[in-house]
């Protein structure tokens, strides 16, 4: 079974990816891990990626696509299947993935899209507060400190609601065309993400049981 997992920041994608991998025994391929492994193992594409990163430049698509192809060519993929997390990020990468899978004689079975109302995500992501004295992290709504006094806590700039909203807007603009691309292929399974973590996973597990 070969899957993609998608979702906005704060939707719980990482949590659900870990649960899927544990239950279904898939190879978890996250872009960060994939880049680090390729560079550590000094693969052809990993060495090329490192040359861009060392110069502080963005890694071009063809190198990213090459790293994905290297990883999907490894022997564990045909045995286990995969869960790809964090790729593709653009329509061009989605087209490249189609070509990679075709060349490797693999096919995509489904795209798990964890769907959470952006307004809920703003509340989730912008509620983080940090104690000035202890550095401990709390959440205004979900994990408030017992002795909350506004003067004793601060918020990081990137946790402020307006910053979070801007970040989500960028992610929505980037992610929407990719989800629609796969929806048109009949591959997308929308999962209601604004519920208990275990309920979200139960829904995903039912979908995947029908796919496997």
Curated annotation (Swiss-Prot):
Role played: Catalyzes the reversible transfer of the terminal phosphate group between ATP and AMP. Plays an important role in cellular energy homeostasis and in adenine nucleotide metabolism.
Coiled coil: none
NCBIfam families from the UniProt entry: adk, PRK00279.1-2, PRK00279.1-3, PRK00279.1-4, PRK14527.1
Alphabetized UniProt keyword annotations: ATP-binding, Cytoplasm, Kinase, Nucleotide biosynthesis, Nucleotide-binding, Transferase
UniProt-recorded name of the protein: Adenylate kinase
UniProt xrefs under PANTHER family: NUCLEOTIDE KINASE (PTHR23359)
GO molecular function annotations of the record: adenylate kinase activity; ATP binding
Source organism of this protein record: Streptococcus mutans serotype c (strain ATCC 700610 / UA159)
């Amino acid at each position: 079974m070969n899957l993609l997992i998608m979702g906005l920041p704060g939707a719980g994608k990482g949590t659900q990816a870990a649960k899927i991998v544990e239950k279904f025994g898939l190879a978890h391929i996250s872009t960060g891990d994939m880049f680090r492994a390729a560079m550590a193992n000094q693969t052809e594409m990993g060495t090329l990626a490192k040359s861009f990163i060392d110069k502080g430049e963005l890694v071009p698509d063809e190198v990213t696509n090459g790293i994905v192809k290297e990883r999907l060519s490894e022997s564990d993929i045909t045995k286990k299947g995969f869960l790809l997390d964090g790729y593709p990020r653009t329509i061009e990468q989605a087209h490249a993935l189609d070509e990679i899978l075709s060349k490797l004689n693999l096919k995509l079975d489904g795209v798990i899209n964890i769907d959470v109302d952006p307004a809920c995500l703003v509340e989730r992501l912008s509620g983080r507060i940090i104690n000035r004295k202890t550095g401990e992290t709390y959440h205004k709504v979900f994990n408030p400190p017992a002795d909350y006094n506004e003067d004793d806590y601060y918020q990081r700039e990137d946790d402020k609601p307006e910053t979070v909203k801007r970040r989500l807007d960028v992610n929505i603009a980037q992610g929407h065309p990719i989800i629609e691309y796969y929806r048109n292929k009949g591959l997308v399974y929308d999962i209601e993400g604004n519920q208990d973590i275990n309920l979200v996973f139960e829904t995903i597990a039912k979908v995947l049981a029908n796919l496997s």
